[in-house]
Design a protein with these regions (language model features):
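Membrane-embedded segments
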Residues: 60-68, 84-151
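Active-site nucleophile loop of the alpha/beta-hydrolase fold
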Residues: 182, 186-196, 216, 261
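Acidic catalytic loop of the alpha/beta-hydrolase fold
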Residues: 234-238, 264-265
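Short beta-strand/loop motif that positions the catalytic acidic residue
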Residues: 223-224, 229-235
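Catalytic histidine-centered segment of alpha/beta-hydrolase-like enzymes
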Residues: 262-272
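An N-terminal hydrophobic leader/cap segment in hydrolases
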Residues: 7-54, 72, 81
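Alpha/beta-hydrolase fold nucleophile elbow
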Residues: 157-167
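Short alpha-helix in the alpha/beta-hydrolase fold that links the catalytic acid
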Residues: 109, 216, 225, 239-248
Length: 282
């Protein structure tokens, strides 16, 4: 057996081994959860309620921040939810967060919605924060998103919900908005599809080995409500071209804003929140 032939065999075996590792451990390349102790006390500067809900064999940890005025007074109309509690005057916003951290860190963005008269719902995916279990498939991730939306639907109608997704959460948000008929959809640093993003990062991996497809473009194209997209021009993780490719799936009145930001600093831009507030008021 020639040296070249042996080398080819060795390279093929190595390639197959690498692909096997990527298939069975790809969650470690996508999800970066930060766990919290079950007795962790959340601390925020505004009123909130802690949520624990069942989702496909495990439990999901969540928070509901109550709508309030800038001077701290709660903003509620006369309508009431299924529990007899008065509803926030502008309805609810649910935020599907990115692939790292947990509720303690993501909760700081609640004020951008509660100050506008929205009750703000935020959940950790399984394996994040206080949530149990672990993500092992796209189906589990979808089950988490469904459980989150169904919880919010206990408090208000779908037509009163603004669905917001950042990074990893953008595809889940688009799916939830389309599936449940939400009022509006807001995407921040979205991917065109998670499968294509993975292929962009790892072009040597065959498509059939990528477990997480999440075709954001399909969900955006099937959503009838207003869509707003924000993307950093200098995004180094999910390039702005992902949002530009979503353009052909948008309707009249939908908007894309390209901002002077990267991936990890876009949520710190006051310009983003100012434009988001304008869109929510339309």
């Amino acid at each position: 057996m020639s040296v070249i032939f042996r080398l080819c065999i060795a390279l093929c075996v190595l390639y197959v081994a690498v692909l096997a590792l990527l298939y069975f451990f790809q969650e470690r390349l996508i999800f970066f959860p930060s766990k919290l102790e079950s007795n962790h006390d959340f601390i925020f500067d505004r009123p909130f309620e802690e949520i624990r809900l069942d989702a496909d064999g495990t439990w999901i940890s969540g928070l509901k921040f109550l709508a309030q005025s800038r001077d701290g007074g709660q903003i509620y109309g006369d309508a009431r939810d299924g529990n007899g509690e008065r509803k926030a005057k502008n309805g609810a916003a649910i935020f599907f967060h990115g692939n790292a951290g947990n509720l303690q860190g993501w909760g700081k963005y609640a004020r951008h919605f509660t100050d506008l008269g929205y009750d703000f719902y935020l959940f950790d995916y399984r394996g994040y924060g206080k949530s149990g279990g672990e993500i092992g498939s796209q189906e589990r991730l979808y089950a988490d998103a469904d459980a989150m939306m169904q919880w919010v639907l206990r408090d208000c109608d779908a037509g009163e919900i603004a669905v917001v997704g950042h990074s990893l959460g953008s595809g889940l948000a688009a799916r939830a908005a389309q599936k449940y008929g939400a009022k509006r959809l807001i995407l921040i640093a979205p991917y065109f599809s998670l499968e294509e993003l993975a292929r962009e990062k790892m072009p040597f991996v065959p498509k059939f080995l990528i477990k997480y497809k999440i075709p954001t473009f399909e969900f955006v194209g099937g959503f009838s409500g207003p869509v707003t997209i924000f993307h950093g021009e200098h995004d180094e993780l999910i390039g702005v071209d992902n949002s530009r490719r979503l353009l052909k799936f948008l309707k009249s009145g939908d908007k894309i804003y390209e901002l002077n930001a990267g991936h990890n600093d876009i949520l710190g831009l006051s310009e983003l929140w100012e434009k988001l507030a304008q869109r929510l008021s339309e």
